[in-house]
């Protein structure tokens, strides 16, 4: 006698027990993934998802969630993906969910994958959304193969990786979402954590889940300067007039004797020499 499991029984809550950094090996290359841009801000998180997918030898296609649904369905149908990835901000979540339902209606065999801070903050509340096939809690790293290997209605837990392993795939994004490529101000980040505990932010969720030691080691460590310069050189190929330094706290660790003091001094000099675009910082 078979047993039918309800979605809330299949989706399980995240444990976030740190079991080591994410594996950067790929066991299932060659699949097709669509990434959905929503809203008017640069989807800086999703471009790292794109980077991880390309590094694992998958094919990607960007679509603009602001475009007509019929137009997007045609593009998706032609590309024939196995998965569609959404990483909306909380303010864009309902829009992304509406789009996922419309796509699911036309293409029921395509798997919708939702991740990002909104999922991280309220995974329990999203279990019963029928248009969502996979929820990804935490970083993308280590999650791609898990998505491919897991049954539907699974909550996937990602794992952190060192910033030196993290590089966004911006060219495809700016070319395929031209209204973002044409923006005069682009984003860049040197680390992905925050030392504060604002009540409206999910930073505290991540820090508590993984622990302060792991959080500092992976989220607060600076990216290699050469990686950031490589990223910024691509910005020069597009219509970029200025760059926003989007770290939650650019000056973290730059007090006298701090770990990042020398890093920031060196970054400033290299940026001036090789990029020389105005920067704005948080």
Locate predicted features.
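N-terminal [4Fe-4S]-dependent radical SAM core
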Residues: 3-29, 149-191
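Alpha-helical structural signal in soluble globular domains
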Residues: 52-56, 102, 106, 129-131, ...
């Amino acid at each position: 006698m078979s047993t039918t499991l309800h979605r809330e029984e299949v989706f399980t809550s995240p444990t976030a027990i740190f079991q080591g950094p994410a594996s950067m090996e790929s066991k299932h290359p060659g699949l097709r993934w669509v990434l959905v841009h929503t809203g008017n801000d640069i989807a800086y998180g999703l471009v790292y998802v794109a980077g991880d997918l390309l590094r694992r030898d998958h094919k990607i296609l960007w679509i603009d969630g602001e475009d007509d649904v019929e137009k997007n369905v045609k593009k998706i149908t032609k590309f024939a993906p196995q998965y569609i990835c959404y990483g909306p901000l909380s303010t864009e979540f309902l829009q992304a969910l509406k789009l996922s339902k419309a796509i699911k209606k036309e293409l029921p065999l395509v798997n919708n994958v939702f991740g990002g801070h909104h999922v991280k903050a309220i995974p329990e509340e999203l279990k019963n959304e029928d248009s969502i096939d996979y929820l990804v809690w935490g970083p993308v790293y280590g999650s791609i193969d898990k998505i491919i290997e897991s049954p539907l209605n699974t909550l996937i837990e990602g794992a952190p990786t060192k910033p030196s392993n993290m590089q966004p795939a911006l060219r495809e994004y700016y070319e395929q979402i031209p209204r973002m490529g044409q923006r005069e101000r682009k984003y860049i980040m040197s680390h992905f954590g925050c030392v504060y505990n604002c009540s409206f932010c999910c930073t505290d969720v991540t820090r508590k889940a993984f622990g302060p030691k792991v959080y500092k080691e992976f989220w607060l460590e600076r990216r290699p300067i050469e990686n950031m310069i490589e990223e910024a050189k691509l910005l020069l190929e597009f219509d970029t007039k200025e760059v926003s330094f989007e770290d939650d706290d650019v000056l973290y660790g730059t007090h006298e004797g701090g770990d990042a003091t020398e890093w920031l001094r060196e970054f400033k000099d290299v940026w001036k020499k090789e990029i020389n675009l105005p920067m704005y910082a948080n």
